[in-house]
Amino acid sequence: MTASTATETLLHKGSGLQVVVGLGQSGLSVAHYLAEQGYQVAVTDNQENPALADKLPATIDIRQFGAIDAELLQQAARIIISPGISLDNDAIAAARAANIPVVSDIQLFCEACTVPIVAITGSNAKSTVTTLVGQMAADAGINVGVGGNIGVPALSLLSNDKMELAVIELSSFQLETVTNLGAQVATVLNMSPDHLDRHGDMLGYHQAKHRIFQGAKSVVINREDALTRPLVSDSLPRLSTGIHAPNKGHYGLITDAAGQTYLARGTERLISADKLKIKGRHNLLNAQAALALGELAGLPLESMLSTLQQFAGLEHRCQYVATIAGIDYFNDSKGTNIGSTMAAVEGLGAVYAPKDGKLLLILGGQGKAQQFGELSPFINQYVSQVLFIGEDSQQIEQHLRAAGLSDEVSLHQCQTLENAFSMIEQVTASSLSQVQAVLLSPACASFDQFNGFVARGERFSQLVKQLNTVSQQALS
């Protein structure tokens, strides 16, 4: 349909038009939801032939593809923007200047949802904690919907009329247009620089993330990260998490005289860290966050601990792949920012440090204008070898060196994962090698060499398996 035809159609159909901008999975869910509610709906997308266009309801006949139609947006009663579309887009900015409401699918969801919402955001670990809380709820016998920025679009959860609890992961892109989410419990797990190309600076990023607390009935706070603390009433119910012994009623870690670490609630030891399948100090924080969120959502503690003990984590998130010649291999391809990589290096590094072991870290890709020098202290403490891949590898090395990287850390420019594995064989063959674990945690986007972090992680795992085969043949 041409722009002129679209305008004529609007004149005939009248006002109240809902315009969906962006036809990804969330945009498609919005289009279906609004059409089912009886709204007049139009869809516009930058792509000439969006892959999901043939899945739109037949009742939506206003479809403007190839560019976001500024004229169409000016006719809207409300615009529902997909997470991948920036508010700075010229057509969107013009619509906002004309006082046309611009919201996300999450705004529609929270307005329509009649069950308690557990809302989770953060720079890292969102998917892990969201999945874990969802599993805890399901294992406790609750009919739970899990979605948002993970898997199922939030609006699609509403089709389950038996749903008793919604657990949703939210990105900063989804939150920047949300008002008064009204969650039963909300949390910002952690904050580190990410998506600054979209939000402008840390202030803009922080403001977007903290919209999750609007209207919340209770909150969970990470004591180790001041940027997660919301500006809410002191009377609002809250629980906190951290790496040290907690105050009464809160979550933390207790280490006994023998050096054994336990998840704890107040002075009560809940479970030994050794009994968990997910490893690393960062995952102990994730486990605490899930327990705290679950408690404030009304889940029973014993059931949550049982689920936690069985939880093996998610693919591409500090995922154990194999042990070859005594060296453990971990796939953290989802580590696409420096905060995530800091957590992975510190979390796993602390596991191997007592045995005088070091990590070999594979780093690089598209750097997203991050300050990689912030990684240097963590690398100095836990890493003996850094292998760089991807288009920004030279710049990342320069950042690390300028930030006081230790001379004891060896750096290798490898460009590709394949070259990195050739270097791994050389490095680990040395009798002087301290490497006890190889960690892919790139701190970068993957689109310079792969079609996403999943493809990058899968390639890493393939190369590990190939290396294992070679190792087995050498032993036979």
UniProtKB/Swiss-Prot annotation:
Belongs to the MurCDEF family. Pathway: Cell wall biogenesis; peptidoglycan biosynthesis. Pfam families: Mur_ligase_C, Mur_ligase_M, MurD-like_N. It is an enzyme of class 6 (ligase). GO terms for cellular component: cytoplasm. HAMAP family: MurD. GO terms for molecular function: ATP binding; UDP-N-acetylmuramoylalanine-D-glutamate ligase activity. ATP binds at residues 122-128. It comes from the Bacteria. NCBIfam families: murD. InterPro entries: Mur-like_cat_sf, Mur_ligase_C, Mur_ligase_C_dom_sf, Mur_ligase_cen, MurD. Its EC number is 6.3.2.9. It comes from Psychrobacter arcticus (strain DSM 17307 / VKM B-2377 / 273-4). This is UDP-N-acetylmuramoylalanine--D-glutamate ligase. Keywords: ATP-binding, Cell cycle, Cell division, Cell shape, Cell wall biogenesis/degradation, Cytoplasm, Ligase, Nucleotide-binding, Peptidoglycan synthesis. GO terms for biological process: cell division; cell wall organization; peptidoglycan biosynthetic process; regulation of cell shape. Cell wall formation. Catalyzes the addition of glutamate to the nucleotide precursor UDP-N-acetylmuramoyl-L-alanine (UMA). It is found in: Cytoplasm. It catalyses: UDP-N-acetyl-alpha-D-muramoyl-L-alanine + D-glutamate + ATP = UDP-N-acetyl-alpha-D-muramoyl-L-alanyl-D-glutamate + ADP + phosphate + H(+).
